[in-house]
């Protein structure tokens, strides 16, 4: 239509959302019904106070047009990435070197884990940061730098945006006992 500076509802329907692509590097989106179409991602998602809360990034749509499901990177995550670009000229994603998934009631019961939420580790890659820190398959990471983790995707997003070579502290459960790296 050739119109600029438009506003849509942009109701937030979920936080910590995944687009469904497990291979994607970022999985902690804000889900909104803002009218985002192919080619106009990158615009701001703002709250009622006019504060930036996210950067519109992706949509789920069979046609490529607005279907009422859009995703935004939270502004605090975007800020971290911008700082890396300023400092290094590129984004350098942190990596633990683990595979895993969300801790759910069935998984907790199967492995005898006394936790309701966290990041379940199914595999630790040899010589990775996780391996060097002593993490093992079956551990459940419950905190990152003293902040509770609710899911594997949250851990993945926070590690990815923490930057390379940064020291972090992980709290985890192993055999019913709490430990820290």
Enumerate the predicted regions with their spans.
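Serine-dependent protease modules
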Residues: 1-133, 143-167, 173-178
């Amino acid at each position: 239509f050739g119109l600029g500076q438009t506003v849509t509802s942009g109701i937030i329907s979920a936080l910590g959302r995944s687009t469904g692509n497990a291979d994607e590097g970022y999985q902690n989106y804000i889900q909104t019904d803002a009218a985002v179409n192919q080619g106009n991602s990158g615009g701001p998602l703002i709250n009622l106070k006019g504060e930036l809360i996210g950067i519109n990034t992706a949509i789920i749509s069979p046609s490529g047009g607005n279907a009422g499901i859009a995703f935004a990177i939270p502004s605090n995550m975007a800020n971290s990435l911008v700082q890396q670009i300023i400092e290094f000229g590129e984004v350098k994603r942190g990596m633990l070197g683990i595979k895993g998934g969300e801790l759910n009631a069935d998984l907790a019961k199967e492995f005898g884990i006394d936790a309701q939420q966290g990041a379940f580790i199914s595999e630790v890659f040899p010589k990775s940061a996780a391996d060097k820190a002593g993490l093992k398959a079956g551990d459940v990471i419950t905190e990152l730098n003293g902040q509770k983790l609710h899911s594997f995707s949250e851990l993945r997003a926070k590690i990815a945006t923490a930057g390379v070579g940064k020291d972090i502290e992980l709290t985890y459960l192993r055999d019913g006992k709490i430990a820290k790296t």
